Regions:
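Conserved strand-turn element in the central/C-terminal portion of the radical SAM core barrel
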Residues: 156, 160-167, 229-238, 264-275, ...
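Contiguous mid-protein beta-loop-alpha structural module that forms a pocket-lining wall or clamp
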Residues: 309, 324-326
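Flexible glycine-/small-residue-rich
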Residues: 8, 196, 234, 262-264, ...
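Radical SAM/AdoMet-radical enzyme domain recognition
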Residues: 186, 215-216, 220-229, 241-300
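Short, solvent-exposed loop/turn segments at secondary-structure boundaries
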Residues: 53-55, 168-173, 203-209, 272-275, ...
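Terminal RNA-binding accessory module
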Residues: 344-438
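Proteins enriched for Cys/Gly/acidic motifs involved in redox and nucleic-acid/cofactor modification
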Residues: 1-203, 213, 243, 248, ...
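Hydrophobic, well-ordered secondary-structure elements that form the walls
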Residues: 260, 301, 321, 329, ...
């Protein structure tokens, strides 16, 4: 029996695909072992979203070869699409597997072990491709399952390489998604998170008569017994209409936790980024969600130091973030990415300036996050318990509310994957609130 070890880099879509590839190899008779252990095959699911991600991908490939020089080292995913020619010349890499070829991993390995040749022909991901069918029966996290529902992106934001590494939008058939989620529910998962490269585009590639979109998919999954919570991955603001929000608010399982990608609060910067909305339109989306849901958690991403971002443009973004008041913000310093339009733009911002701006927004994020959590003190809430933690020497069982606020109860055996209700009485630290059970 051959041993295989996996290492995942990057987003939740990659995590889903890594789980699916592990299960493919298990079904083919491989033993899956931890990455640090000796293996016959090392599979690194790479990321290429930034130059740093490229470097980490190369480092992990070389680390695997050093761990066992006789093992087959397999590079999979986005970095393969971005730098396949370079990887073919890398002596640490034995096999390359592009996006939309992961379902064929077992056959690719069989062929390799038969003749020890790297046949890695990378598909042109930019050409029209069908959705690559990968499936899972379980997830390493035993309370929350990430479900991939689409791949690819048609947006071509000026800073982003992903449309070139993932290709155009390809949506998964809704009946296939439903079948997988029913299976996940049957083995005990209570929460699912719908994820994709551009989740809001789900269904745009279907023929008109199919009339499937993200909202119809959510309604379908809302009916599945055993699923108590349905959480959405990152959304484009333009999907949030009054009708969309009203329909979601009627559903049994939907979590009032919305990650709306912003990137900048300045219209001039948004235009250079090729984001297809302005700050006022984004704010209107947030207002709709707050009118249709009780105290929803709204989170976002912000890029500082985008080419041409002046002090006034940054100040405009800062004012906008203060006005919206997010639960959490992921702050990124712009990373120049070869192959994107932004990499060749004039007025690149110095790294020192990016760091100063990042620090300012991180401080704002911390303040706003504390204020949002504080609203829950004294309120009755429900948390889905996930894992044991220790705070100041005391052991607790920690989970999340539907808004993704962390809560904890005193530790007891057998609480994992249980839902408990109670009152949040105090903060145990900056991130976790204490729930006194009913």
């Amino acid at each position: 029996m051959r041993k295989a070890a996996f290492h995942n880099l990057g987003c939740k879509v990659n995590s889903y695909e890594t789980e699916a590839m592990q299960q493919l190899l298990e079904d083919a008779g491989y033993e899956i072992v931890p990455f640090r252990e000796g293996a016959d095959v090392y599979i690194i699911n790479t990321c290429s979203v930034t130059n740093v991600a490229d470097r980490k991908s190369r480092q992990m490939l070389h680390r695997a070869k050093k761990m066992n020089p006789s093992a087959a080292v397999v590079a999979v995913g986005c970095y393969v699409q971005a730098a396949g020619a370079e990887l073919k010349k890398d002596e640490a890499v034995d096999l390359i597997v592009g996006n939309n070829q992961k379902k064929d991993l077992v056959q690719i390995l069989d062929d390799y072990f038969a003749d020890h040749e790297n046949s890695g022909e990378i598909l042109d991901i930019g050409h029209s491709q069908e959705y690559e069918e990968l499936h899972i029966r379980r997830i390493a996290d035993h309370t929350r399952a990430f479900i991939k529902v689409q791949d690819g992106c048609n947006q071509f934001c000026s800073y982003c390489i992903i449309p070139y590494t993932r290709g155009r939008v390809r949506s998964r058939r809704p009946e296939d998604i439903e079948h997988e989620v029913r299976g996940i529910a049957e083995v005990g998962y209570k929460e699912i998170v719908l994820t994709g490269i551009h989740l809001s585009s789900y269904g745009v590639d279907f023929k008109d008569e199919q009339k499937e979109n993200l909202l119809t998919l959510i309604k379908r999954l809302d009916q599945i017994p055993g699923i108590e919570r349905l959480r959405l991955g990152s959304l484009e603001p333009r999907i949030v209409t009054r009708e969309f929000a009203k329909e979601l608010a009627r559903l049994r399982t939907i979590c009032p936790h919305f990650h709306l990608s912003l990137q900048s609060g300045c219209d001039a910067t948004l235009k250079r980024m090729n984001r297809r909305y302005n700050a006022a339109e984004y704010q209107a989306c947030c207002e709709i969600l707050r009118e249709e849901f009780d105290n929803p958690a709204i989170t976002t991403d912000v890029i500082v130091g985008f080419p041409g971002e002046t002090e006034e443009e940054f100040a405009e973004t800062e004012r906008f973030l203060k006005a919206i008041h997010f639960y959490e913000m992921h702050i990124f310093k712009y990373s120049r990415r070869a192959g994107t339009r932004a990499a060749d733009m004039p007025d690149q911002v110095p790294e020192g300036t990016k760091s100063v701006r990042s620090d300012i927004l991180l401080a704002l994020e911390k303040q706003q996050s504390l204020e949002y959590r504080g609203r829950f003190l004294g309120t009755e809430e429900e948390i889905l318990l996930e894992e044991p933690i220790e705070i100041d020497g005391t052991k607790y069982m920690m989970g999340h509310t539907r808004q993704y606020v962390k809560g904890a109860v005193p530790y007891e055996e057998g609480l994992k994957n249980k839902t408990v209700k109670g009152i949040f009485t105090k903060a145990l630290n900056e991130e976790v609130l204490l729930l006194e059970k009913e």
